Amino acid sequence: MKGMILFISCLLLIGIVVECKEGYLMDHEGCKLSCFIRPSGYCGSECKIKKGSSGYCAWPACYCYGLPNWVKVWERATNRCGKK
């Protein structure tokens, strides 16, 4: 019984520590990375380059899952797109 409780506790701890980020990728200007006229699989490739687990075109921008915490993703509160 103690072993089962320890096992479940470890799983919960791993879930907290291995938390990953998700969101819209940004271009060099701080805007969402567009996929409007890109080929199929473009967003998945871009997400993999950023070490994400997967991604897709959430028209019209690339959305990624499983990104490391160092990757900057677009956020409404800190949006700098088109601003100087």
Swiss-Prot record:
Domain of life: Eukaryota
SMART domains documented for this protein: Knot1
The protein, known as: Beta-toxin Tf1a
CC annotations in GO: extracellular region
Misc. remarks from the entry: Negative results: shows a weak peak current inhibition of Nav1.1/SCN1A, Nav1.2/SCN2A, Nav1.3/SCN3A, Nav1.6/SCN8A, Nav1.7/SCN9A (17-30% inhibition of peak current at 100 nM). It does not inhibit peak current on insect (BgNaV1 from Blattella germanica) and arachnidan (VdNaV1 from Varroa destructor) sodium channel subtypes (tested at 100 nM).
Gene3D superfamilies found in the cross-reference section: Knottin, scorpion toxin-like
Keywords: Amidation, Disulfide bond, Ion channel impairing toxin, Neurotoxin, Secreted, Signal, Toxin, Voltage-gated sodium channel impairing toxin
GO molecular function: sodium channel inhibitor activity; toxin activity
CDD domains: neurotoxins_LC_scorpion
Location within or outside the cell: Secreted
Signal peptide: 1-20
InterPro entries in UniProt: LCN-type_CS_alpha_beta_dom, Scorpion_toxin-like, Scorpion_toxin-like_sf, Scorpion_toxinL, Scorpion_toxinL/defensin
Disulfide partners: C31-C81, C35-C57, C43-C62, C47-C64
Organism: Tityus fasciolatus (Central Brazilian scorpion)
Domain notes: Has the structural arrangement of an alpha-helix connected to antiparallel beta-sheets by disulfide bonds (CS-alpha/beta).
Family: Belongs to the long (4 C-C) scorpion toxin superfamily. Sodium channel inhibitor family. Beta subfamily.
Function: Beta toxins bind voltage-independently at site-4 of sodium channels (Nav) and shift the voltage of activation toward more negative potentials thereby affecting sodium channel activation and promoting spontaneous and repetitive firing. The toxin induces a leftward shift, on all channels tested (including Blattella germanica and Varroa destructor Nav1), displacing a change in voltage dependence activation to more hyperpolarized potentials. In addition, the toxin mostly inhibits peak current of hNav1.4/SCN4A (53% inhibition of peak current at 100 nM) and hNav1.5/SCN5A (71% inhibition).
Domain (LCN-type CS-alpha/beta): residue spans on this chain: 21-82
GO BP terms in the entry: defense response
Entry comment describing in which tissues the protein is expressed: Expressed by the venom gland.
UniProt cross-references to Pfam families, sorted A to Z: Toxin_3
Modified residues (Cysteine amide): C81
